[in-house]
C-alpha cells in the first residue's frame, strides 16, 4: 500500500500556467461553464448527514399538515388480503413526540444495512491491512500481455469494488504506472482504471459489501410500507455478473478508440519506477489462493447437497437472507489471514485485530449517517407518508400509462442525475428507496428490478461528479502527470465513459427485460 500511496504524491511546480489553462477552459467552453455551474451548485449542498436531518424535519412538519387535511388513501394490502384505508399520522402531537424520543435508539440498532456493512468490513479490513488486496491487484495487472492491458485494468477496477473503496487508492495510481511502462499515455491508464472502479462500481462477478448494504435499505423501505416481501442480497447477482463483461468491453473501446487517441503522445517529463510483486507477496498469494479454494469447496458442500447444512426444508432462502454476510466476511478474512501470515504482514493475532479495528474506525462517518438515515426511514414508516406517496404516485403513473420498461429507464436517468449532487450510494438510496420501491411495487415491478435500475444510474455518473468523495484524489493523481489539468479536463476525459456506460448498461437491461432472464437467484422483473 505504501508503494501505491507514494505514486500519488504530487510534484512541486509553479501553478500559474495551470491556473491560466483551467480558467481559459472554463471561460471559453460552454461545457466548461456547465461543469462550473455543476461544481458551484454541488458545493452548496450540505453534508448528507445534514440532508437527512432536514428531510426528517420536513417529514415531521408535512405529517402534521397532511394529518390535518385528513387525506385518505385506499389500496389493497396483500399481507392483510383486503382493501385498507389509511390516513397520515402526525409527529407533532404528544404521541408523535414520544415516538421520536423513545424509538431513536431502536431505529438505529435495527437499521438493516448497519450490521451487514460492519460485519462484512471486518473481513475486508483484514484482507486490505494484510496487503492481500494490494498484491492481488498488482499481480493481476502487471502479469498481463500488452494487448490485453486495457481490458485487464478496467476489469481489475470493476472487481476491486468487492473491497469497497480500495480500488481508488490502489488501482487508479497503478493504472498510470502500468500504461507508462508499456509506453502509453498515463492519463489513459488513470481513465481506464477510474472508469472500472467508479463507473462500474455496482458490477461484479461476485458479491461484495454493496449488495447486502443496498438490499438492506430496500428491505427497510418495504417494511416501512408494510409490504410482505424480502429481497435477498443476491437479487441482482446474475445481471451484475454479465454487466462486468459488458463494461470491460465498453471500457476497452472508449479507452483505445476515443480517449487515448484524443490524448495523443505523452510528452511529460515524469517517469515511474517499475512496480513488482515481491517474493513474499507471491508466496502469500499462492497460500491465500489455496485457502480460498478450500473455503469455497467447504462452502459448496454446505449448500449443494439435498441435506446441506445451510438448507432449511431443502431451501436456501433463509440462508441467503440471514447467513450470506458472514460468508462474505470469511471470504476476505480467511485468505487475508493466510496471506498476512505467509507474507509476514501479520506476525500475531494483534496485527489482525489492528487491521480489523482500523476498518471499523474508518466506518465512523457511516455510523453517523446510518443514525440519521434510520430516523428518517422510520419517521416515514410511522407517519404513513411513504405509503401515501407510493400509492398515490403509482396510481398517477398508472393512470397516464407510464409503467413497465419506460418507467424503469426514466428512473435510471433520474438516479444518474441525482448522483451528480449526492455522491454516497447508500445515502441516495436511503432517500429514494422509501418512495420508489413501494411505488414500483404497486405497479407490479419487483424491488430487485427497482434497485437494479438505481444501481445503473448511480454508478455511471460517479466519474463526472466533482462531489464524488474520491474525485479530489483522482485530480491529484492526474496532476502528477499533467500540471495543466483542471477539473473540467478530468471530467471531459471521463465523460465518454459515463455516457457510453449509461447507454450500454441501460440497453443490456432492456434486452434482459425482454428475454425474461432472471436478474438474480430470486430476481424476477414483474410481481406475479
Q: Can you name each region flagged by the protein language model?
A:
Residues 30-31, 132-136, 249-273, 300-311, ...:
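Juxtamembrane interface elements at the cytosolic ends of transmembrane helices
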Residues 45-57, 81-134, 317-387:
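Core transmembrane alpha-helical segments of multi-pass membrane transporters/permeases
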Residues 65-95, 210-214, 307-313, 383-392, ...:
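Interfacial/capping segments of alpha-helical transmembrane domains
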Residues 117-119, 145-176, 181, 367-373, ...:
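Hydrophobic alpha-helical transmembrane segments of multi-pass integral membrane proteins
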Residues 52-67, 117-125, 156-158, 196-200, ...:
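Hydrophobic core segments of alpha-helical transmembrane domains in multi-pass membrane transport
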Residues 39, 43, 170-266, 453-455, ...:
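Membrane-core helix-loop-helix motifs of multi-pass transport proteins
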Residues 33-34, 72-114, 224-232, 302-319, ...:
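Interfacial loop/helix-cap signal at membrane boundaries in integral membrane proteins
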Residues 94-96, 106-114, 141-152, 186-188, ...:
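Membrane-interfacial loop-to-helix junctions in multi-pass transporters
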Amino acid at each position: 500500500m505504501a508503494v501505491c500511496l507514494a505514486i500519488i504524491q504530487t510534484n512541486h511546480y509553479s501553478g500559474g500556467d495551470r491556473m491560466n489553462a483551467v480558467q481559459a477552459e472554463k471561460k471559453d467552453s460552454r461545457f466548461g461553464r456547465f461543469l462550473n455551474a455543476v461544481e458551484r451548485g454541488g458545493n452548496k449542498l450540505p453534508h448528507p448527514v445534514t440532508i437527512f436531518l432536514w428531510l426528517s424535519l420536513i417529514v415531521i412538519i408535512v405529517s402534521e399538515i397532511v394529518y390535518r387535511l385528513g387525506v385518505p388513501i385506499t389500496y389493497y394490502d396483500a399481507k392483510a388480503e383486503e382493501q385498507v384505508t389509511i390516513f397520515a399520522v402526525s409527529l407533532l402531537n404528544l404521541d408523535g413526540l414520544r415516538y421520536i424520543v423513545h424509538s431513536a435508539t431502536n431505529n438505529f440498532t435495527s437499521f438493516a444495512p448497519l450490521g451487514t456493512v460492519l460485519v462484512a468490513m471486518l473481513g475486508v479490513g483484514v484482507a486490505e491491512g494484510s496487503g492481500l488486496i494490494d498484491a492481488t491487484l498488482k499481480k493481476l495487472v502487471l502479469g498481463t500481455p500488452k494487448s490485453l492491458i486495457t481490458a485487464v485494468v478496467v476489469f481489475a477496477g470493476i472487481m476491486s469494488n468487492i473491497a469497497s473503496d480500495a480500488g481508488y487508492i490502489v488501482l487508479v495510481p497503478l493504472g498510470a504506472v502500468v500504461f507508462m511502462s508499456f509506453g502509453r499515455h498515463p492519463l489513459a491508464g488513470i481513465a481506464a482504471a477510474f472508469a472500472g472502479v467508479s463507473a462500474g462500481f455496482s458490477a461484479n462477478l461476485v458479491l461484495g459489501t454493496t449488495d447486502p448494504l443496498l438490499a438492506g435499505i430496500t428491505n427497510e423501505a418495504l417494511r416501512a410500507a408494510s409490504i410482505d416481501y424480502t429481497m435477498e442480497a443476491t437479487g441482482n447477482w446474475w445481471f451484475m455478473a454479465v454487466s462486468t463483461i459488458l463494461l470491460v468491453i465498453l471500457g476497452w473501446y472508449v479507452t483505445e478508440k476515443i480517449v487515448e487517441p484524443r490524448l495523443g503522445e505523452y510528452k511529460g517529463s515524469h517517469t515511474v519506477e517499475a512496480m513488482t510483486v515481491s517474493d513474499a507477496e507471491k508466496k502469500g498469494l499462492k497460500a491465500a489462493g489455496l485457502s480460498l479454494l478450500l473455503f469455497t469447496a467447504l462452502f459448496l458442500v454446505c449448500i449443494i447437497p439435498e441435506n446441506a447444512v445451510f438448507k432449511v426444508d431443502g431451501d436456501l432462502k433463509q440462508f441467503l437472507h440471514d447467513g450470506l454476510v458472514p460468508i462474505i466476511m470469511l471470504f476476505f478474512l480467511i485468505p487475508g489471514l493466510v496471506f498476512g501470515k505467509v507474507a509476514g504482514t501479520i506476525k500475531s493475532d494483534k496485527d489482525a485485530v489492528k487491521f480489523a479495528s482500523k476498518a471499523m474506525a474508518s466506518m465512523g462517518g457511516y455510523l453517523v449517517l446510518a443514525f440519521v438515515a434510520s430516523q428518517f426511514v422510520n419517521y416515514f414508516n410511522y407517519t404513513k407518508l411513504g405509503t401515501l406517496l407510493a400509492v398515490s404516485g403509482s396510481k398517477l403513473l398508472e393512470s397516464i400509462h407510464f409503467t413497465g420498461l419506460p418507467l424503469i429507464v426514466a428512473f435510471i436517468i433520474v438516479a444518474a442525475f441525482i448522483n451528480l449532487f449526492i455522491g454516497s450510494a447508500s445515502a441516495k438510496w436511503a432517500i429514494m428507496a422509501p418512495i420508489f420501491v413501494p411505488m414500483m411495487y404497486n405497479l407490479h415491478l419487483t424491488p430487485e428490478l427497482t434497485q437494479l435500475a438505481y444501481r445503473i444510474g448511480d454508478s455511471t455518473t460517479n466519474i463526472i461528479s466533482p462531489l464524488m468523495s474520491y474525485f479530489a484524489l483522482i485530480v491529484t493523481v492526474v496532476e502528477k502527470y499533467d500540471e495543466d489539468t483542471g477539473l473540467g479536463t478530468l471530467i471531459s476525459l471521463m465523460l465518454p465513459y459515463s455516457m457510453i456506460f449509461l447507454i450500454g448498461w441501460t440497453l443490456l437491461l432492456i434486452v434482459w427485460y425482454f428475454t425474461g432472464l432472471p436478474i438474480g437467484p430470486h430476481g424476477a422483473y414483474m410481481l406475479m
